[in-house]
């Protein structure tokens, strides 16, 4: 199945993104002749992983967990967070991370009347959620969240910042042309 054959309104891209409490802006401004000063946490703290989905309508259900993604965490995300929100006939697309491969993943997805597709290796250009994660990380850098609670709050705000127009643009850029025109 390729982008030109399937209705892009049925596509759901799923991926994960790691973040931590020492993210800081990569550039800034200061008065002419003065050096910009910014303190950055030396201790990254534990990694927080965001499991999320994106459709042409925008960001879908997400889950933030401490640590990395395991098969058990991913299965729980599918079973309790993502799949209850999806209707039948959706095509769920993800990369081939080992945590995405257990047989139960396919069983859960197909049991809900959806289809599972894996992207070929080294093909993040075909996954519109990668661009959403780029925007999310930019927002997180500006937020300078230094505690887990502040990071989770900033993640919620960053997810909300992905607009319908953003999502449609991410899909277009990845080669999944929508049936209609961008608004």
Model-predicted segments: where are they?
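Short functional hotspots at interaction and active-site rims
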Residues: 1-183
């Amino acid at each position: 199945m390729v982008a030109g054959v399937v209705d892009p309104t049925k596509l759901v891209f799923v991926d994960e993104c790691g973040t931590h409490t020492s993210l800081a802006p990569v550039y800034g401004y200061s008065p002419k002749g003065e050096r910009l000063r910014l303190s950055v946490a030396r201790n990254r703290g534990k990694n927080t992983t965001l499991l999320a989905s994106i459709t042409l309508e925008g960001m879908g259900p997400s889950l933030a967990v401490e640590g990395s993604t395991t098969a058990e965490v991913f299965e729980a995300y599918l079973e309790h967070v993502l799949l209850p929100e999806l209707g039948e006939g959706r095509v769920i697309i993800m990369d081939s991370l080992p945590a995405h491969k257990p047989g139960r993943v396919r069983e859960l997805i197909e049991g809900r009347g959806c289809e599972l597709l894996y992207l070929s290796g080294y093909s993040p250009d075909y996954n519109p959620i990668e661009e959403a994660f780029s925007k999310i990380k930019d927002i997180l850098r500006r937020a300078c969240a230094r505690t887990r609670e502040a990071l989770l709050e900033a993640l919620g705000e960053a997810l909300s910042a992905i607009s319908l127009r953003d999502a449609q643009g991410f899909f277009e850029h990845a080669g999944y042309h929508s049936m209609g025109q961008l608004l």
